[in-house]
Amino acid sequence: MSGFTHYIIGIDTMLALTGDHPVVGDCPESKPVYDPDSVGILKMLTKMEQTNCDCGGNELSGGAPHFYKGASVAPVYDPIELQINKLRQKVESGAMYIQTRGIFDLDSFKRFLDLVDAAGIKTHIMAGIIPLKAAGMAKYMNENVLGIDVPQDMIDRLAAAAAEGKEKGIKGLPMQLGIEMAAEMIARIHDEHLCDGVHIMAIGAEKNVPTILDKAGIRI
């Protein structure tokens, strides 16, 4: 479905993403296509809004869509300066809000926010929260998902929860621990006013989101 169709049916918020390399997907042999990338998408939408023309220069008789445009950033990246520079490009190209990749270490997230502030980049940032389900899930993301760094102590806690569950015949202890850890991070982000909000990537376990928010003390 095109962006125009989304706008017509009332969806007025858009997240511009370049996308991951196909090597981490279901068809690793396919060719990556980054035309346009996230910055290009933002520039295209912003130009459409300003000129009332599509990307080919044709006037839009019904008026250009005006999306609340967003983009993403990886707070854990080496060298982090590349992400700061890319973030600046995205904001200057029209991004009004930013969603981060999953974060698991609030101290490193704070350092990233300090760098954003020092660079003079003004935008609304939402921290990405991924509730972990198992130690294997955390290890897989560390090895295969760019910009993700789950600390070893979290992995060890999940492994210990699995061992305890096996010993006592209790299912789901690692997932319960993942819910607790996600709630703890959200509560700290809220209480310390670290950023403008969070977005929870539950990855097939969306039913747990209300529980996570409740444990974090968040009322909607």
List where the protein language model places each region.
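Active-site glycine- and acidic-residue-rich loops that bind
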Residues: P32-G40, T100-L113, K133-G136, I203
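Conserved, mostly hydrophobic/aromatic
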Residues: H6, K90, G94, A127, ...
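Catalytic beta/alpha-barrel core
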Residues: L15-A16, M96-D105, P174-Q176, G197-A202
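Flexible, glycine-rich active-site loops centered on histidine and acidic residues
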Residues: M1-K43
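Active-site pocket-lining/capping segments in soluble small-molecule metabolic enzymes
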Residues: G19, P32-G62, S72-Y77, I84, ...
